[in-house]
């Protein structure tokens, strides 16, 4: 019967307050707030310190156009006063920036894909045929012979057919150039012609 009573008291938790008292006594013996003390660490400056592993600081990247790096376009130590830019420095920078914008040294480069084929109006039949051959280098010799065979009929009918052929070829070249421009606009390589005309 005695052991059963002891188990009942143990289940209720009669030993817990004694444990708490023991913890309090232990903390008093150790001293005031020992577990909350922060460890002291020596923090060294990474740039000044010389370590065996070498310099860990990455090198600075030059992200400035060397064309604009000159004595007039650089802020000097005497341009700052109490952490702000001085009036003389601001005036100098404004004058130099205006001079650069008004008289650009180099023309802006055009991308290679923006080149357009210059189309000239054909004055003669022979000139237009040579021009079409230059514009269409992918035509095989077999196709050229077929075109020549088609141009065999004589008289005014032959001239009309030749004119129609030239018009069709020019239309084909124009349509191909328009399709290429549309593809460039879709890919984002060039501006829309309406937008470029307004700008």
Curated annotation (Swiss-Prot):
Residues 113-127 have a biased composition (Basic and acidic residues). It comes from the Viruses. Residues 96-155 are annotated as: Disordered. This is ORF1/1 protein.
């Amino acid at each position: 019967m005695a052991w059963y009573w002891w188990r009942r008291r143990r289940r209720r938790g009669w030993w817990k307050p004694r444990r708490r008292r023991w913890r309090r006594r232990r903390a008093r013996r150790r001293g005031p707030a020992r577990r909350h003390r922060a460890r002291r660490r020596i923090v060294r400056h990474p740039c000044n310190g010389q370590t065996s592993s070498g310099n860990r600081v990455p090198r600075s990247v030059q992200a400035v156009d060397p064309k604009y790096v000159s004595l007039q376009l650089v802020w000097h130590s005497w341009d700052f006063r109490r952490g702000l830019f001085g009036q003389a420095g601001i005036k100098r920078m404004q004058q130099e920036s205006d001079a650069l914008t008004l008289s650009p040294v180099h023309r802006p480069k055009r991308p290679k894909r923006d080149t357009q084929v210059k189309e000239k109006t054909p004055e003669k039949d022979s000139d237009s045929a040579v021009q079409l051959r230059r514009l269409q280098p992918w035509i095989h010799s077999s196709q050229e012979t077929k075109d020549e065979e088609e141009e065999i009929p004589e008289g005014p009918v032959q001239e009309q057919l030749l004119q129609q052929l030239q018009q069709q070829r020019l239309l084909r070249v124009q349509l191909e150039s328009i399709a290429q421009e549309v593809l460039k606009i879709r890919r984002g390589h060039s501006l829309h012609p309406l937008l470029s005309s307004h700008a």
